[in-house]
């Protein structure tokens, strides 16, 4: 405890500059400051040199699952068919360990020319504009007008348009109603009371190894924040300063909310899940596949991944749920799901910009990519994907429900790797301790606050 008090007394760290303009504050109005900043930065950027007449080789990297890998590779082949002098060499893998790999590349100046990035990487690896090119310098080759100002503003850091958003995303509940029906429940949960009643019904009617919902450690943190925002109507932290908006007592209440879900048999304890599955994602678990876990709180873009993972006895029950209103306010946030950026070490930025434009804006590329990276944020890309029937209905339904409901802003430090990393992050430490040690919110709040301060949050 003395260490925590010492840090709280003496380490008052200013937060990173945030993404003003991404969303309105909980229940508030949108901020045009970042959009105007984006416009002013665009006016002062010198354009890059033109296209090369010689053969060009580009490199590109991304993370994802098999269907995303296939979509990118097919789109790259189509791009090279139209631009025969440009060869694109891809590097891709699953998410696990990917950020560590890319952070090393960014630090060494050896990252690929075009990179799929997480939004917070702009702050983690290019807070001063040192890593990614200002895309205002390639507007002859990349049509930035296809994105709304607010979406572009979310990716404008250090007065530079460092990436374009591929899609916007947020969390929503997916349910397996086949299992719910077996427990005598015919409607998707829409309130906290519904969740608690489902936990009791599952245990009594189906047995101790059936649960209405599963939450991993990071999922628990996101739902905890969703709950607090729903109750108190304020962002988790100020998006421009990363100053925490919640008191220690309020955060302890949020942690105890998660504990109540474990105690009420709504969610499986983490020790029980790890015992069966290790660090495997929920959609890979036997419990999800066979319907013993009947709900998940996930990114909207994951809808088809979770639906397709169900076995034949359960597939028909997959349902995109509704956001649950835990209080008087609409909690939850949306964010840039991922962006495409050009590294400053790229020797052919004009061609790299053409590749991004092809993938996200042009009919051929956007129709191949479809919704593999979420519902397209580009207006032209969305129209092309829809015309080709390439936007998956489940993903579109989930995304629409998220965007219609959530009202809070995300700050750029929330997803810091030291906080959310599987196995080693602060969020994992907090929620593992909750289950393994029988701790309470009051016991664990300092652990969470210490971890947040360590990555740059200002904690009162």
Predicted ranges, named:
Residues 78-147, 178-190, 286-295, 457:
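Extracytoplasmic "Venus flytrap"/periplasmic binding protein-like
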Residues 131-132, 137, 302-304, 338-418, ...:
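Mature extracytoplasmic/periplasmic domains
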Residues 158, 162-166, 171, 196-251, ...:
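Extracytoplasmic/periplasmic solute-binding protein
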Residues 199-200, 243-276, 324:
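Glycine-centered hinge/linker elements that transmit conformational signals in sensory
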Residues 240, 396-457:
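C-terminal capping/gating helix-and-loop segments adjacent to ligand/active sites or protein-protein/ligand interfaces
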Residues 81-82, 87-89, 183, 263-267, ...:
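Extracytoplasmic/periplasmic substrate-recognition and gating elements
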Residues 42-50, 119-170, 319-323, 393:
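Hinge/lid segment of periplasmic solute-binding proteins
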Residues 105, 112-113, 142-179, 211-212, ...:
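A structural signal for short loop-to-beta-strand junctions that line the ligand-binding cleft
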């Amino acid at each position: 405890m003395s260490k925590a008090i010492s840090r709280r007394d003496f380490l008052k760290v200013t937060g990173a500059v945030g993404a003003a303009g991404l969303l309105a504050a909980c229940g508030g109005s949108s901020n045009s400051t970042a959009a105007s900043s984006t416009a002013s930065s665009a006016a002062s950027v010198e354009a890059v040199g033109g296209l090369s007449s010689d053969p060009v080789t580009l490199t590109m990297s991304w993370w994802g699952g098999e269907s995303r890998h296939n979509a990118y590779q097919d789109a790259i082949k189509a791009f090279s068919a139209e631009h025969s002098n440009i060869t694109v060499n891809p590097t891709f893998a699953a998410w696990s360990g990917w950020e560590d790999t890319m952070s090393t590349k960014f630090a060494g100046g050896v990252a690929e020319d075009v990179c799929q990035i997480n939004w917070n990487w702009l702050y983690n690896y290019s807070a001063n504009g040192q890593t990614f090119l200002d895309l205002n310098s390639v507007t002859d080759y990349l049509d930035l007008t296809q994105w709304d100002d607010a979406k572009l503003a979310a990716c404008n850091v250090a007065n530079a348009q460092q990436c374009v958003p591929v899609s916007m995303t947020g969390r929503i509940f997916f349910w397996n109603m086949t299992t719910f029906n077996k427990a005598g429940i015919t409607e998707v949960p829409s309130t906290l009371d519904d969740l608690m009643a489902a936990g009791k019904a599952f245990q009594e009617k189906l047995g101790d190894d059936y649960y209405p919902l599963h939450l991993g450690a990071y999922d628990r943190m996101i739902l905890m924040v969703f709950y607090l925002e729903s109750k108190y109507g304020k962002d988790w932290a100020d998006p421009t300063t990363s100053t925490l908006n919640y008191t220690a007592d309020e955060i302890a209440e949020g942690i105890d909310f998660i504990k109540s879900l474990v105690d009420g048999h709504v969610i499986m304890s983490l020790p029980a899940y790890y015992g069966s599955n290790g660090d495997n994602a929920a959609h890979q678990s036997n419990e999800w596949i066979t319907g013993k876990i009947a709900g998940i709180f996930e990114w909207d873009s994951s809808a088809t991944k979770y639906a397709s993972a169900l076995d034949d006895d359960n597939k028909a029950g997959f349902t995109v749920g509704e956001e649950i209103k835990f209080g008087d306010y609409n909690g939850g946030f949306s964010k840039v799901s991922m962006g495409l950026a050009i590294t400053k070490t790229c020797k052919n930025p004009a061609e790299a910009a053409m590749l991004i434009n092809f993938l996200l804006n042009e009919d051929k590329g956007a129709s191949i990519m479809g919704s593999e990276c979420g519902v397209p944020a580009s207006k032209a890309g969305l129209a092309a994907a829809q015309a080709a029937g390439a936007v998956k209905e489940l993903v579109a339904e989930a995304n629409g429900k998220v965007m219609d409901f959530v009202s809070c802003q995300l700050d750029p430090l929330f997803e810091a790797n030291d906080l959310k990393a599987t196995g080693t992050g602060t969020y994992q430490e907090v929620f593992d301790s909750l289950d393994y040690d029988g701790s309470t919110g009051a016991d664990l709040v300092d652990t969470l606050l210490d971890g947040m301060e360590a990555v740059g949050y200002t904690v009162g």
